[in-house]
Amino acid sequence: MSLFPSLPLLLLSVVATSYSETVTCEDSQKICPAVIACNSPGINGFPGKDGRDGTKGEKGEPGQGLRGLQGPPGKLGPPGNPGPSGSPGPKGQKGDPGESPDCDSSLAASERKALQTEMAHIKKWLTFSLGRQVGNKFFLTNGEMMTFDKVKALCAKFQASVATPRNAAENRAIQNLIKEEAFLGITDENTEGQFVDLIGNRLTYTNWNNGEPNNAGSDEDCVLLLKNGKWNDVPCSSSHLALCEFPI
């Protein structure tokens, strides 16, 4: 390998070294004005990494924020307990006398008479269709079959009592009214063999069938009016026609 090609490079190095030792910065600027001035600030580098969080600061003073808008009204709460009664108010002034129309006694009497007439017509209709009237008694049936206790309850509901004939005329009126055997208001529930009405009075009229009362079933404590008008003792638990009497 030849050494000659390297010789020019070696000479250039020596010249550059010697030149750099003698040329100052001011001279270099005169020689090469395009060269950047010596010791001039460089270009800013990239931002560094974030530092660590500092210590927690002291609590600041309360802020002065603006008051918000008023919210919608809430739901109604439960009603409270009633308050104590207030004291009576002052007494008012006496009012003027009222005006009362003159009572027309003749008008009242005519209306009363008309009402009585209408009630009499109603009684006649009932008598014709459903019942019989004898003296001051009105016998009525609803046509239903029931036990003696239910008959008593039914009659009491209408402020009446179970039909109890006190004479032959009343007995015959009931006989003509019924189409089925009906209970009478007579029993010997309290004392066997001693038949009385429902308020405990002894009977002053009877119309027993032949051989009756015989208490054949040992519990025949009620009385039945047969279709022939005669009486027979029967159990109160049996069901027969309901018949009531109304005082008029």
UniProtKB/Swiss-Prot annotation:
Coiled coil, from the record: 112-130
Presence of keyword Mitochondrion: no
SMART domains: CLECT
Disulfide-bonded cysteines: 155-244, 222-236
Range of residues in the leader sequence: 1-20
Keywords: Calcium, Coiled coil, Collagen, Complement activation lectin pathway, Complement pathway, Disulfide bond, Hydroxylation, Immunity, Innate immunity, Lectin, Mannose-binding, Repeat, Secreted, Signal
UniProt modified residues of type 4-hydroxyproline: 47, 73, 79, 82, 88
Composition skew (Pro residues), residue ranges: 75-87
Entry remark concerning the domains of this protein: The coiled-coil domain mediates trimerization.
Protein role: Calcium-dependent lectin involved in innate immune defense. Binds mannose, fucose and N-acetylglucosamine on different microorganisms and activates the lectin complement pathway. Binds to late apoptotic cells, as well as to apoptotic blebs and to necrotic cells, but not to early apoptotic cells, facilitating their uptake by macrophages.
Xref: PANTHER family: MANNOSE-BINDING PROTEIN C (PTHR24024:SF34), PULMONARY SURFACTANT-ASSOCIATED PROTEIN A (PTHR24024)
Name of the protein described by the UniProt record: Mannose-binding protein C
Organism for this UniProt entry: Trachypithecus obscurus (Dusky leaf-monkey)
Gene name per UniProt: MBL2
